[in-house]
């Protein structure tokens, strides 16, 4: 999948040049062709075994940009303690975007002067602590850990992850207070240094005295084409959370900033609006036991040392924790022409059992806290009404999506149906598509025995959080075995079938993950092979089965998958898993020893137990705990493809932290991850059904840079309460921010598994990570294409474009043939851009294109003489031909192409171009007049049903082709 994304980017490099030159529609695909792919086309991430299941709903078109609206399903298995979102268990609504934050240490924006050391305590203000040449030396680490005023402040930057419009990545603050971005395309991150106050009441909390710290207002991310994406900006677009049981003491933290605005370079905008919903909660079970800790010292009677011991074991009931979340829900998306509204309703779905809250309620009742229990759920903080207050926790479901035009007419809609019963988790059952009041196509979904899933916090989950149908009592000797995966129960609740509007269906057959290798206790040291395969929690795809008729008799196994290293030898009997578990599971630590820094003779030995295993360290890549180095995809005709991926066992191990204070170590401590390097395709081999190799493709990669973020965890604690003898702990580590990008593809074609014909393609990138050069093997030589973009030139226009982060446009493109050390220029094209400030100060358009063959002088091939007030090209010369384009429907579509005419000729007949174009409906009478009066011109005209498609094309001879759509906006007749 990563390679597919990169190849898409290579194609887009050409679109940046030619997409601005107007081209009228040439044809439309047939209704049959437009319905292809309605079943069975389910791409799979072979490395993780997770199929990409997506239901496309609608594409919002804004000029040349498309904003897809879809639903996607994450088919990795069901974690029963994770609450479903508003479109049901496993499903996500894909539209707009979000920036989500992982808080490290304390929030980067933390600044509350009401607390001692709270002023400017977040990393955003404290970044300079890592702006030292010896930041990763143990001596400096200990200085920070032992200094109260330093260690009590944030030394570990938060991670901000983004996902919008096909862009995914993360950004983190550097030690120089700059935003460093990791993304496969160049993105600029801006924070406007503004903050927003928390929008929740302070009554009944310590905030009445101390207040809440304000959060980052939001961020603006600019993509390489200059389009700006604004996140946050108002509190209704920001989600917050705090500790569920310590609501009176904790402070609200901003966790997510939602996309509120897209600003295109021509000034058009897409506005996203949100509503603040009722509070919800995410609860979890977290048992932490002190199994016995004590000090050791040898000071003698003249130098008495602190002596203390501890032991603390609690029940399951005392170990429930959680977060109170203040969610937001997308209300609508608005453009100048379209309004998409999202309607939600309260659900009746399964809720957390009251027993989860009762223990903490009992503790509160016997305490003298002085603040109400669960105060944010109380209507009146002076009236305790537990447990009725739990009803203030309300979950919602998305019930309808309504797409309306600027007149308010319903163009298209989707009605979502769920099981929505109090005994089960919310699950999406069907999507009904509506159009102009008609009930139409239906997608429906079937799941594997969802009624078999346990209640929330059943204490019946495996090491990775998946259901295993086994209770896990706190018996330390046997606890590991209680948490082992159960293949049978892993299947409950997973999506099994999608029924499509065409009547066909796709069935999914899943199987548990397995692995043959795992990392050593110190994950950066080695990848160890086991004597046999072991089962892991979660699911991977085994088979995809299609039926075009919806009948079992027509079932066809489209694809079958084998995650093994010995398939070539043993075929379907292959047994040796290629899976690697990204870490070891450990719950008990019996020999963790720390030494005092201010008394060298004192040590503290600790034994600990934690029910939360080492999940933060048990990851391979792409958020999965198991990654597969080798995968076989067997197709319906018995041909098969062998895929090999980068993984721990072929050179992509993580690295240890730079410095660690204490000698004893646990898997909990930070490390330097290289997960960005894992999961990339390095070899693909295509075989016949008889096992004969027909094609081989290998892929090479490089790191885009050596960039990394500095990070530090540091602090100290007292050896014993009430003493000044203390021990320090700390780690410095790196967060790599480079991209792992493809630099070479080599493909070999085989006639009979021997004497292959081999060719390669090499890629070179510029300083912004955009494609600079492609070199292909051709005809005993190499064909090389070079791109020079705006940052290679110092003209005022190019500098202005770079300043506005418009980096992708190509200024010069050249093609050469290289053979025997000689380079021969084949073709050169130059693109000249001009600013269209009458539209916006961010819009630049191609004014002219010059081309030359070999070493001949450049000749003008295209020139745009005039643009309208929206930036559309209206009068051009291509070669020797003058062409006028008439735009209509408020500048949205080309309604006429007039060849062999000038703008003056056209405006002399119909009036000004802008007056014609701004009308909601074109004056086709004026087009008829043009056909009559411009005898030597060739006029081709187009009509449209706005936001649906083209309805007719009439050529210069007066011959017309008509297109008809059904009420659900699908093309049905030509």
Outline where the language-model segments fall:
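Bacterial Sec-dependent N-terminal signal peptides
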Residues: 1-22
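N-terminal-proximal low-complexity accessory segments that begin disordered
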Residues: 23-77
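Non-catalytic interaction/targeting regions
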Residues: 58-61, 78, 82, 88, ...
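Acidic, aromatic-enriched beta-alpha/helix-loop junctions
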Residues: 70-100
């Amino acid at each position: 999948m990563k390679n597919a994304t990169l190849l898409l980017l290579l194609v887009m490099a050409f679109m940046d040049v030619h997409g601005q030159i107007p081209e009228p529609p040439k044809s439309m695909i047939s209704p049959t062709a437009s319905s292809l792919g309605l079943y069975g086309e389910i791409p799979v991430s072979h490395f993780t075994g997770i199929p990409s299941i997506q239901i496309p709903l609608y594409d919002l078109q804004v000029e040349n940009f498309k904003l897809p609206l879809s639903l996607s399903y994450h088919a990795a298995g069901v974690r029963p303690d994770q609450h479903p979102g508003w479109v049901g268990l496993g499903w996500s609504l894909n539209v707009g975007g979000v920036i989500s934050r992982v808080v490290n240490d304390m929030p980067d924006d933390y600044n509350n002067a009401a607390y001692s050391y709270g002023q400017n305590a977040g990393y955003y203000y404290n970044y300079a602590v890592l702006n030292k040449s010896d930041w990763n030396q143990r001596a400096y680490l200990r200085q920070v850990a032992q200094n109260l005023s330093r260690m009590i402040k944030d030394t570990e930057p938060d991670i901000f992850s983004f996902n919008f419009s096909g862009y995914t990545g993360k950004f983190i603050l550097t030690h120089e207070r700059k935003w460093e971005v990791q993304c496969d395309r160049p993105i600029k991150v801006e924070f406007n240094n503004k903050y927003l106050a928390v929008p929740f009441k302070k009554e009944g909390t310590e905030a009445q005295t101390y207040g809440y710290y304000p959060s980052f207002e939001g961020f603006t991310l600019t993509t390489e084409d200059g389009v700006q994406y604004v996140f946050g900006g108002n509190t209704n677009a920001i989600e917050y959370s705090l500790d569920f049981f310590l609501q009176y003491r904790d402070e609200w933290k901003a966790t997510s900033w939602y996309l509120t605005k897209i600003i295109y370079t021509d000034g058009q905008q897409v506005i996203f609006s949100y509503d603040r919903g009722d509070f919800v909660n995410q609860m979890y079970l977290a048992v932490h036991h002190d199994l016995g800790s004590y000090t050791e010292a040898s000071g003698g009677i003249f130098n008495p040392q602190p002596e203390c011991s501890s032991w603390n074991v609690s029940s399951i009931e005392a170990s429930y924790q959680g977060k109170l979340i203040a969610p937001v829900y997308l209300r609508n998306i608005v453009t100048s022409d379209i309004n998409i509204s999202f309607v939600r309703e309260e659900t009746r779905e399964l809720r957390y059992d009251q027993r989860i809250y009762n223990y903490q309620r009992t503790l509160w009742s016997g305490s003298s806290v002085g603040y109400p229990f669960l105060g944010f759920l109380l209507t009146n903080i002076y009236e305790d009404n537990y447990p009725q207050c739990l009803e203030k926790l309300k979950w919602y479901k998305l019930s309808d999506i309504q797409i309306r035009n600027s007149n308010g007419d319903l163009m298209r809609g989707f009605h979502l149906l769920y099981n929505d019963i109090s005994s089960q988790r919310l699950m999406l059952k069907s999507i009904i598509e509506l159009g102009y009041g008609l009930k139409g196509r239906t997608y429906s979904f079937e799941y594997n025995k969802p009624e078999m899933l346990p209640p929330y916090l059943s204490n019946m989950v495996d090491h990775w959080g998946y259901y295993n149908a086994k209770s896990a009592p706190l018996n330390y000797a046997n606890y590991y075995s209680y948490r082992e995966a159960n293949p049978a129960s892993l299947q409950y609740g997973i999506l099994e079938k999608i029924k499509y509007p065409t009547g066909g269906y796709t069935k999914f057959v899943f199987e548990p993950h397995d692995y043959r290798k795992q990392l050593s206790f110190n994950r950066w040291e080695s990848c160890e092979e086991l004597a046999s395969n072991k089962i892991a929690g979660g699911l991977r795809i085994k088979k995809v089965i299609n039926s075009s008729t919806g009948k079992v008799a027509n079932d066809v196994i489209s694809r079958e998958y084998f995650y093994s290293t010995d398939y070539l030898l043993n075929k379907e009997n292959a047994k040796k898993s290629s899976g690697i578990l990204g870490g070891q599971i450990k719950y008990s630590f019996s020999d963790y020893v720390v030494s005092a820094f201010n008394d060298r003779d004192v040590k503290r030995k600790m034994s600990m137990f934690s029910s939360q295993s080492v999940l933060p360290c048990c990851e391979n890549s792409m958020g999965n705990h198991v990654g597969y180095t080798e995968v076989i995809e067997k197709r319906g005709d018995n041909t098969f493809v062998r895929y090999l991926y980068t993984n721990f066992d072929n050179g992509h191990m993580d690295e240890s932290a730079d410095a660690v204070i204490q000698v004893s170590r646990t898997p909990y401590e930070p490390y330097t991850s290289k997960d960005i390097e894992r999961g990339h395709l390095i070899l693909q081999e295509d075989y016949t059904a008889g096992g004969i190799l027909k094609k081989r493709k290998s892929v090479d990669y490089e790191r885009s840079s050596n960039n990394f973020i500095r990070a530090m965890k540091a602090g100290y604690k007292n050896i014993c309460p009430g003493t000044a003898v203390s021990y320090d702990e700390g780690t410095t580590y790196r967060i790599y921010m480079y991209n792992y990008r493809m630099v070479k593809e080599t493909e070999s074609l085989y006639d009979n598994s021997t004497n292959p014909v081999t060719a390669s393609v090499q890629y070179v990138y510029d300083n912004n990570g955009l494609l600079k050069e492609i070199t292909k093997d051709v005809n005993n030589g190499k064909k090389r294409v070079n791109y020079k973009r705006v940052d290679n030139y110092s003209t005022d226009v190019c500098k202005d474009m770079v300043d506005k982060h418009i980096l992708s446009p190509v200024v010069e493109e050249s093609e050469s043939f290289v053979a025997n050390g000689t380079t021969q220029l084949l073709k050169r094209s130059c693109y000249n851009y001009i600013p269209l400030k009458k539209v916006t100060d961010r819009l630049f358009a191609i004014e002219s294109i010059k081309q030359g063959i070999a070493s001949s002088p450049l000749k003008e091939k295209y020139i745009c003489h005039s643009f309208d007030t929206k930036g559309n090209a209206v009068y051009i010369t291509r070669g020797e031909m003058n062409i006028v384009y008439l735009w209509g429907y408020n500048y949205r579509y080309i309604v006429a192409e007039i060849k062999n005419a000038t703008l003056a000729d056209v405006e002399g007949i119909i009036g000004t171009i802008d007056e014609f174009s701004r009308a909601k409906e074109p004056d086709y009478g004026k087009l008829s007049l043009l056909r009559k009066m411009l005898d030597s011109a060739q006029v081709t005209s187009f009509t449209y049903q706005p936001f649906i498609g083209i309805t007719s094309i009439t050529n210069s001879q007066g011959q017309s082709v008509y297109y008809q759509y059904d009420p659900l906006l699908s093309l049905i007749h030509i």
